[in-house]
């Protein structure tokens, strides 16, 4: 038997507008990236990442086998939506704050957009790290057709003019 290949599940894409976008498939690797991004890189205040993953509670229920995930685990299930919202509010945002080493982030700019196709939770806040202010925006989307969650993470530097 061969060992399972543990290569990082990340792809770097350059959009038509020239923006660099990192796409992750694993929550732990995304969190590791955030932690190392603030430690190692000067571009921590200008990052755009996307993550597509199954929430831990879904994988736990399916015994860590994506093939066993129920078809009912989607945005039409009240139980799934409730558990996903708890996962985002109590775990994901907290882990992002810890990875960024910014315990003062409160993500007080919250909104929820809901339609038949999907539910989107938006979170935003401003932070400061190494005397540089930036805006952080997180968008979490669940769709009606499967349990996969899309997370969009973006930081934008704030200049003195944009703060005033």
Swiss-Prot record:
It is a peripheral membrane protein. Keywords: Cell membrane, Membrane. The keyword Cell membrane applies. Its main location: membrane. It comes from the Eukaryota. One of its GO terms (cellular component) is plasma membrane. Disulfide bonds: none annotated. Involved in the control of energetic metabolism and significantly contribute to cell fitness, especially under respiratory growth conditions. Belongs to the RGI1 family. This is Respiratory growth induced protein 1. It comes from Vanderwaltozyma polyspora (strain ATCC 22028 / DSM 70294 / BCRC 21397 / CBS 2163 / NBRC 10782 / NRRL Y-8283 / UCD 57-17) (Kluyveromyces polysporus).
